Amino acid sequence: MDCVANFIEAKYHLAVAERMMKGYSKYPEKRFLIGVINELVRAISKLIRAFFIYENIKKGSLDKFLKKVAPKYLDDITIENLAKVIEIGQAQKVSPIEFAKGEKIILLIRGKYRFLTATRIDEFIKSFNTAISAFPKNFRQI
């Protein structure tokens, strides 16, 4: 796949995540927030692939992206939020306990309870929008 296709798929998954957040505001259920996290993880992985292709990096990893590629285009807060979303997405898949209380999701990750709020997930979406707009190609309007 080329750079443009990965970028378009990243924007698609972002749009799905944004629609799911709107759905959550109408029907506050845990599955919407979990869906938003999963869509953001997909979007971030597609955007990372697009950055690697743009930078002509053949074999990339998350660590390589965070240390070499991302600092060229993104601010520290955005980089931190993207890494946090991927970490949460991976942890959510293996978490033996996952439930919602109010607007919080509670996950058991490595023996510790972690709380994730809808507000924080919305911040992740905004950070990803920043990352999308920082992409160096001129096809952002797609």
List each language-model region with its residue ranges:
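Charged alpha-helical initiation segments
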Residues: M1-F32, R140-Q141
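Long, charged low-complexity segments
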Residues: I57-A134
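Amphipathic alpha-helix face/heptad-repeat signature
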Residues: C3-H13, V36-L40, R120, F124
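Amphipathic, well-ordered alpha-helical segments in soluble domains
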Residues: Y12-M20, E39, K46, S127, ...
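Short acidic alpha-helical/loop segments enriched in Asp/Glu that coordinate divalent cations
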Residues: K26-F32, F52-K64
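Short, hydrophobic, well-ordered secondary-structure elements
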Residues: L33-E55
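Short acidic DE-rich linear segments
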Residues: A134-I142
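Short secondary-structure capping micro-motifs at structural edges
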Residues: E29-V36, V69
